[in-house]
Regions:
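A structured, charge-rich N-terminal accessory region that forms the first stable segment of a protein
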Residues: 1-43, 48
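A short acidic (Asp/Glu
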Residues: 14-15, 76-84, 108-113
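Long, hydrophobic/aromatic-enriched structural stretches that serve as scaffold segments
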Residues: 37-89
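Short, conserved secondary-structure transition motifs
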Residues: 99-124
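A conserved mid-domain beta-alpha-beta active-site/ligand-binding segment of alpha/beta enzyme cores
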Residues: 119-199
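Short acidic, hydrophobic short linear motifs in intrinsically disordered regions
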Residues: 201-213, 222
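Charge-enriched amphipathic alpha-helical scaffolds
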Residues: 213-245
Length: 308
């Protein structure tokens, strides 16, 4: 039996104080807002994907060992802390749960993930699996709880403690916190990168996609994430970029081109603040960022989130 982890947890609401069933429904509504599988992320069938991994794990009497395969990037690390938190206390203690987790592989100088490895290279990783320890479960539960909390300071604190049990977690958390509006201009790191590329007037999203990773230590931005960011920036009031899509683009998320607006150019230059100019209503994990409320921002000089 096998299953995939398909939830882009760094986007949309992941609030605290919900049962697993309630959280599942929140995520399904976010990923398929029109009650159509994959409505916002056409590559996903969230109703199936989000329930399948739970069902596979619950059938523990049908396997001797559960092997988790995860990478070092933000997407995988958030799914890892969720699944470890979910498993802990649900599976019998005698059930073997093992983890294969890598951030590099010989012969792949800019390692992107398991998907680029040949079958024999993937098979070679099996002997490197290690049984999940109690320390790993505890760290995952602490990080998952902090990720879902209504304020991000606890998550900020997690990455400053000893996270060696999950060696890629601290860097992933840091990258997630950089998606908060920055103190310098109100843009997230991803928004700033996309607006920078939009200075090349008329650049296509398909051309922008690989360049979004130029300054990233780990590849995590999906085509759905890029399309969502471009749409948000084009729909803000006033818009920060224009998004032109040909007729019949349909589910092809990256069939379109972008260009900076005057407001986008001013925000990118630091002459205006994105939150002040356009307002904000966004979920990051358990934090609901809204104009008029307590806003948290990423201070790149101090390398932490601060209230503003």
């Amino acid at each position: 039996m096998s299953s995939i982890w398909a939830d882009v947890l760094y986007e949309g609401p992941v609030p605290a104080n919900l049962s697993d069933a309630e959280l599942l429904e929140v995520r399904v509504r976010f990923l398929a807002p029109d009650d159509e599988p994959g409505a916002s992320h056409p590559s996903l069938d969230p109703v199936n994907d989000l329930r399948q991994w739970r069902a596979v794990i619950e059938r523990s009497d049908g396997y001797d060992e559960l092997i988790l395969w995860f990478e070092h990037d933000l997407f995988d690390q958030l799914n890892l802390i969720q699944v470890l938190s979910w498993i802990h206390g649900r599976l019998p203690s005698e059930k073997t749960v093992s983890l294969v987790m890598i951030g590099s592989f010989a012969g792949h100088p800019r390692f992107k993930g398991l998907g680029e490895l040949r079958p024999d290279e993937i098979a070679s990783l099996l002997d490197r699996r290690q049984r999940v320890s109690e320390l790993q479960y505890q760290l995952a539960e602490a990080a998952w709880g902090a990720f879902r909390a209504p304020a991000p300071d606890g998550l900020d604190d997690i990455r400053r403690r000893d996270t060696s049990a999950l060696p890629y977690l601290a860097a992933a958390i840091t990258r997630f916190l950089q998606e908060y509006p920055w103190t310098s201009d109100g843009l997230s790191r991803t928004e700033r990168r996309l607006l920078s590329l939009a200075r090349e007037s008329g650049i296509s999203l398909i051309s922008a996609f690989p360049r979004m990773h130029d300054d990233e230590q780990a590849y995590y931005i999906t085509d759905g994430s890029l399309a969502s960011t471009a749409t948000d920036l084009a729909r803000s009031l006033p818009p920060l970029l224009t998004l032109s899509q040909p007729a019949g683009a349909g589910a092809d998320l990256l069939r379109g081109s972008i260009a900076l607006t005057e407001t986008g150019r001013a925000v990118l230059a630091g002459e205006q603040d994105r939150v002040v100019a356009c307002g904000l209503d966004r979920w990051l994990g358990g934090v609901h960022l809204q104009s008029g409320g307590t806003l948290w921002r990423w201070d790149d000089t101090r390398q932490r989130v601060i209230p503003s």
